[in-house]
Amino acid sequence: MRLMIIFDLPVETSEERKEYRKFRKNLINEGFIMIQYSVYVRVCVNKKSAEFTEKRIESFLPSKGVVQSLILTEKQYNDMHFLLGKKIKEVRNSAERTIIL
């Protein structure tokens, strides 16, 4: 499963920029990878794990803006089409079950 976080946060004041940086840093610390600006994704073992991660994200939400989550199966995530640009080739972002180092 994949948990995708999509957000649009205001960055007009220095306090808003600080909240944006803190939120982004917390997402990265939770194991999320940026696939586009303001779109982050993380691999989760199952739906329960994804829902648990959603709850953890609720604990560090910024005070303003829009933050949405989307839980996807591996098949749904792999059906994503790149109309322009290239897929991120990062090991943590791989759908493969076995990784040989």
Curated annotation (Swiss-Prot):
InterPro entries: CRISPR_associated_Cas2, Virulence_VapD/CRISPR_Cas2. Its EC number is 3.1.-.-. It is an enzyme of class 3 (hydrolase). Keywords: Antiviral defense, Endonuclease, Hydrolase, Magnesium, Metal-binding, Nuclease. One of its GO terms (biological process) is maintenance of CRISPR repeat elements. Mg(2+) binds at D8. One of its GO terms (molecular function) is metal ion binding. It comes from the Bacteria. Its cofactor is Mg(2+). Disulfide bonds: none annotated. Homodimer, forms a heterotetramer with a Cas1 homodimer. HAMAP family: Cas2. Belongs to the CRISPR-associated endoribonuclease Cas2 protein family. CRISPR (clustered regularly interspaced short palindromic repeat), is an adaptive immune system that provides protection against mobile genetic elements (viruses, transposable elements and conjugative plasmids). CRISPR clusters contain sequences complementary to antecedent mobile elements and target invading nucleic acids. CRISPR clusters are transcribed and processed into CRISPR RNA (crRNA). Functions as a ssRNA-specific endoribonuclease. Involved in the integration of spacer DNA into the CRISPR cassette. This is CRISPR-associated endoribonuclease Cas2. It comes from Ligilactobacillus salivarius (strain UCC118).
